[in-house]
């Protein structure tokens, strides 16, 4: 069985790990961080993968970060923003002691240059949406944003690393084009070497804040999970990021950490895994069929068999730590009701609904999810429905998603800032909808092409109120989306990392990024304790 196969593999991995041991003394004080996947661009106006954003968080700075209580902590800003009574003018005082990596002074003109560039050429329209109307320089170190409308999520937006400032001098020839292979920002590290598989970071001596606790970082990408796992086991790397490895190896590392053989760190659960259904073409244009497919998934079984429970079942699009995320409106596994809906649409009793399910072939958890779900459908609904699996490399999936190429596809999403807006808008916003079909907008780009009457108004309303009224609107949005059944949330993932005992346990910020500047080696005496 699938469970037996996974368990056997995990046992072999655990044995190999135990026999080889975790600790190899390092002769360098530099720290090596390993992950999978390549970085094709460093341009904040284009970067969207977790891997790339993690790097940006080390070489760039946001205007603000979030404290543990959710309040804003000024970073490049000098203090909290001032917002006008109508909510449409936002004034941001900036620090006066910041320089870019090329020595250029950071000021309001530089920040305005970067924001205007992002608004002009950025491919990540969901980050800002239609909120910012104009960017103005009010004083040498005072920036003013004119908004099209009041925005409750603006504070979260101002923490986005995608809006990190760039040196106007370094990007003078790239005001209207992307710069993929270099980055000149204000962060605690400067980039001294870049290719898709390796990046070398050196501490920035003129950094305005606390200096890094290490003399430099080497970020490397290895080709597969086994290579990454082996590199940590042999001591070739100091830190390993969890998104890079197979579930059985992740489980093995989790068990090793419990025994004290290495450090494990867990960040905030902000990444959602979900399935998108193509809603604008037959047969899945039939809402009852989409609802039946949603009812056929047993999340609890998937969580346990695929991830040993490390990925928690999720029945919402909004992570539970955010406003409106404390509910679970999506229905639980119910094959009996699924069969009723399938029969109403003419299936069962000799007629099967064939659903092509695409998984990203280079994402290990995707294939295990697909196989587990396929087995569930075969067990519960064999006479009514069958899943046909197809593995496609992730870059191809992302490129073809907005073309309507996939009837059903497994994806994941990490909001660019911790606010419900950063999860709902990228999946649901639509600039041109006809009934329940989105012709143009993020819902089309995300591959569902689904909308609903009243949904776009509700999305805007949710970003104009706070507290209980906002939660009520967010709940309405989720209810509409549940009924439409174009998205099926599957699980919630916390970022994890493992480090040698020679490195202090890694820490995460509230946005889910590893604090790379906090990585620090410990003395041999501390290591032995």
State what each model feature region is.
Residues 23, 81, 383-402, 425-501, ...:
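Extracytoplasmic/peripheral linker and loop segments enriched in polar/acidic and small residues
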Residues 35-85, 116, 184-185:
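N-terminal lobe/hinge region of extracytoplasmic solute-binding protein
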Residues 79-123, 138, 144-146, 231, ...:
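Aromatic- and charge-enriched surface segment that lines or borders ligand/interaction sites
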Residues 93, 127-171, 193:
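Surface-exposed binding/hinge segments that line
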Residues 134-136, 192-200, 218-281, 304:
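Extracellular/periplasmic solute-recognition and catalytic clefts
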Residues 159-212, 216, 226, 336, ...:
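Gly/Pro-rich hinge or "lid" segments in bacterial periplasmic/extracellular proteins
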Residues 312-345, 361-368:
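Structural transition elements
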Residues 345-415, 495:
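Ligand/substrate-recognition segments at binding pockets and active sites
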């Amino acid at each position: 069985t699938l469970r037996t196969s996974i368990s056997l593999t995990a046992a072999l991995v655990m044995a190999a790990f135990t026999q080889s041991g975790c600790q190899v003394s390092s002769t360098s004080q530099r720290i090596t961080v390993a992950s999978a996947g390549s970085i094709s661009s460093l341009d904040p106006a284009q970067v969207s993968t977790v891997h790339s954003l993690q790097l940006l968080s080390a070489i760039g700075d946001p205007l603000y970060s979030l404290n543990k209580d959710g309040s804003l902590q000024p970073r490049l800003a000098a203090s909290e923003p001032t917002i006008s009574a109508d909510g449409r003018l936002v004034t941001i005082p900036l620090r006066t002691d910041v320089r870019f990596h090329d020595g250029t002074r950071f000021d309001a003109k530089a920040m305005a240059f970067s924001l205007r560039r992002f608004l002009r050429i950025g491919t990540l329209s969901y980050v800002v949406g239609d909120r910012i109307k104009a960017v103005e320089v009010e004083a040498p170190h005072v920036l003013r944003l004119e908004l099209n409308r009041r925005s409750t999520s603006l504070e979260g937006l101002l923490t986005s690393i995608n809006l990190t400032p760039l040196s106007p001098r370094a990007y003078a020839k790239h005001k209207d084009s992307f710069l993929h292979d270099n980055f000149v920002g204000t962060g605690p590290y400067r980039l001294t070497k870049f290719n898709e598989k390796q990046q070398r970071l050196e501490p920035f001596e003129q950094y305005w804040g606390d200096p890094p606790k290490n003399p430099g970082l080497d970020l490397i990408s290895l080709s597969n999970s086994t290579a990454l796992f082996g590199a940590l086991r042999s001591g070739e790397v100091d830190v390993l990021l969890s998104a890079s490895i197979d579930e059985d190896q992740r489980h093995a590392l989790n068990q090793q950490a419990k025994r004290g053989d290495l450090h494990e760190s867990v960040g905030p659960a902000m990444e959602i895994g979900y399935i998108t259904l193509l809603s604008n073409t037959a047969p899945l244009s039939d809402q009852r069929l989409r609802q039946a497919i949603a009812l056929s998934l047993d999340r609890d079984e998937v969580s346990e068999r695929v991830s040993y429970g490390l990925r928690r079942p999720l029945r919402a699009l909004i992570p539970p730590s955010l406003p409106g995320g404390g509910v679970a409106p999506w229905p639980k596994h119910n094959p009996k009701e699924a069969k009723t809906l399938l029969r109403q649409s003419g299936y069962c009793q000799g007629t099967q609904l064939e659903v092509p399910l695409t998984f990203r072939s280079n994402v290990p958890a995707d294939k295990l999810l697909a196989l587990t779900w396929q087995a569930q459908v075969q067990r519960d609904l064999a006479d009514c429905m069958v899943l046909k699996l197809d593995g496609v490399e992730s870059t191809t999936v992302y490129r073809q998603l907005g073309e309507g190429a996939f009837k059903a596809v497994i994806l994941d999403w990490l909001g660019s800032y911790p606010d419900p807006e950063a999860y709902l808008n990228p999946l649901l916003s639509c600039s041109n909808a006809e009934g329940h079909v989105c012709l143009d907008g993020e819902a089309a780009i995300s591959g569902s092409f689904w909308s609903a009457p009243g949904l776009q108004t509700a999305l805007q309303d949710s970003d104009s109120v706070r507290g209980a009224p906002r939660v009520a609107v967010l709940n309405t949005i989720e209810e509409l989306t549940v009924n439409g059944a174009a998205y099926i949330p599957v699980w919630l993932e916390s970022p994890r990392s493992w480090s040698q005992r020679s490195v202090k346990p890694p820490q995460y910020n509230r946005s889910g990024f590893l604090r790379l500047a906090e990585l620090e080696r410990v003395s041999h005496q501390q290591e032995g304790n």
